[in-house]
C-alpha cells in the first residue's frame, strides 16, 4: 500500500454521522501509515453563516415535527433538477479549489453528499479519484454523480438503489 498518497476527507455538520465517519476514516488512514490526511468541513469553511443557519434549521426540523424533517431530508430529490438548486452545485467551490491547490490530494473522500467535488472535476478536468462514503439510509440524488468513482454504502437497500439507477456493480461496496 502506498502511504504517500494524499487524502482529503470532506464532511459537514448536519447530524453527527457525517463527522463521525470522517473522524474514523482519518484515524484509520493515520493508523495505516498515511502521511498526508486532511479533514475539511467544507461548507463551514466556505460559507460559515449559511452553514450555521442551515444547521440550525436542520436541528429545528426534529423538534418541529416529522413533516418538516421529511421535507428537509427527502425533499432534496424533488428540487434536485431545478435551476434554483444549481447554487448547491457550486457551494464550497472556491474553498475546494484552495484545498486542492494546498494539499494536492490523490484521493477525495466525501462523507456528506457534496456535488461540488464531481462538478469541480467536470469543470476543471482535474481527475482526482472521488469516493462517497454514504452515511444515509436512503438514496438521495445528491450523492450520485457520474464523476464519483466509488460508493461505500451502509445498507443493501442503498446498494440496490444505486444498482437500480445504473451504477456499475464494481463501483458500489
Residue map of PLM features:
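Short His-centered aromatic/hydrophobic patch
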Residues: 111-114
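Proline-aspartate-enriched helix->loop->beta-strand connector
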Residues: 100, 104-106
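Conserved N-terminal ligand/cofactor-binding loop architecture of enzyme catalytic domains
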Residues: 24-97
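Short, well-ordered alpha-helical microsegments
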Residues: 18-19, 46-47, 116-118, 139-141, ...
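Active-site-proximal region of nucleotide-activated glycan assembly enzymes
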Residues: 124-173
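Extreme N-terminal starter segment of soluble prokaryotic enzymes
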Residues: 2-8
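A short, glycine/small-residue-rich beta-strand->loop->alpha-helix junction that serves as a flexible
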Residues: 12-21
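Structural motif
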Residues: 106-107, 150
